[in-house]
From Swiss-Prot:
This is Large ribosomal subunit protein uL2. Residues 271-287 have a biased composition (Basic residues). It comes from the Bacteria. Part of the 50S ribosomal subunit. Forms a bridge to the 30S subunit in the 70S ribosome. Residues 216-287 are annotated as: Disordered. The lineage of its organism: Bacteria, Bacillati, Cyanobacteriota, Cyanophyceae, Synechococcales. GO terms for biological process: translation. InterPro entries: NA-bd_OB-fold, Rib_uL2_dom2, Ribosomal_uL2, Ribosomal_uL2_bac/org-type, Ribosomal_uL2_C, Ribosomal_uL2_CS, Ribosomal_uL2_dom3, Ribosomal_uL2_RNA-bd_dom. GO terms for cellular component: large ribosomal subunit.
């Protein structure tokens, strides 16, 4: 994949950097692997907003992805690499020798015609899936299961990869993209290689309208609201917060307050916590 930068012919193209989609080999998805998807728009089953700044956006059809890789010991071949509007990673259409078709996440380095297979004793090649206990130390993996047979739950984003760093009894230690080291049961499946389309981190939407196409609505700072709408609101002009620190719209302390539950069941499986980011991310905005 490559990226394409635009000249500033208009304000919307001044900062625009997008994928060139050179790796896409098919424009129409496989109809048998499509299902309709209802957009929740940030609402729960009662219609109450549980996630702000969501709504609108282009209609999408969900592509059924094979995260389980449970078609064991049946060779398959990648026949196309496609765009998926529901994720940053590309997806690959696989034809298996028994005639079945499935979508998988496209690993970095594969192309049309690459053979893949899933099983306990498969070759250590990009795109193949196998239990963690059979993967050599130092190998890069993605689409990792946390519960055997449930399907991959972590390391699925574009460009993401984990590394097998140790094997201890019934567990395998993985170094995750966040630098956290976590123990996973040895019988859990993982796919060899990293997820493709890593250059997506270098892209830029360029204008607010493209954000709306993705279903993201504007985020209004609390300091420009009225006191009835946000604890930061009110005052004359650009007034300070008036508190010891920033808070959420519901008065809970923000920016630095730990949100992970104490005595969580998975605490015993985490050997090393992820390091704190030196840069302030989305949470650094005036909530």
């Amino acid at each position: 994949m490559g990226i394409r930068a635009f000249r500033p012919y208009t304000p919307g193209t001044r900062e625009r950097v997008v994928s060139d989609y050179a790796e896409i080999t098919r424009n129409e998805p496989e109809k048998s692997l499509l299902v309709s998807k209802h957009r929740r728009k940030g609402r729960n089953n009662r219609g109450v907003i549980t996630c702000r700044h969501r709504g609108g956006g282009h209609k999408r059809l969900y592509r059924i992805i094979d995260f389980k890789r449970d078609k064991r010991n049946v060779p398959g071949k990648i026949v196309s690499i496609e765009y998926d509007p529901n994720r940053n990673a590309r997806i690959s259409l696989v034809y298996y020798e028994d005639g079945e078709k499935r979508y998988i996440l496209t690993p970095a380095g594969v192309h049309v015609g690459t053979p893949i297979i899933a099983g306990d004793e498969t070759p250590i090649e990009v795109g193949n899936a196998m239990p963690l206990q059979n993967i050599p130390l130092g190998t890069t993996v993605h689409n990792v299961e946390l519960v055997a047979g449930k399907g991959g739950q972590i390391v699925r984003a574009a460009g993401a990869s984990a590394q097998v760093v140790a094997k201890e009894g019934n567990y395998v230690a993985l170094k995750l993209p966040s630098t956290e080291v976590r123990l996973v049961r040895k019988e859990c499946y993982a796919t060899i290689g990293a997820v493709g389309n890593a250059e997506v981190r270098n892209t830029s939407l360029g204008k607010a309208g493209r954000k709306r196409w993705l279903g993201r609505r504007p985020e209004v700072r609390g300091s420009v609201m009225n006191p009835v709408d946000h604890p930061h609101g009110g005052g004359e002009g650009r007034a300070p917060i008036g508190r010891s620190g920033p808070v959420t719209p519901w008065g809970k302390p923000a920016l630095g307050r730990k949100t992970r539950k104490k005595n969580k069941q998975s605490d015993c499986l985490i050997q090393r916590r992820r390091r704190k980011s030196s840069k302030r991310g989305r949470g650094g905005r005036d909530a």
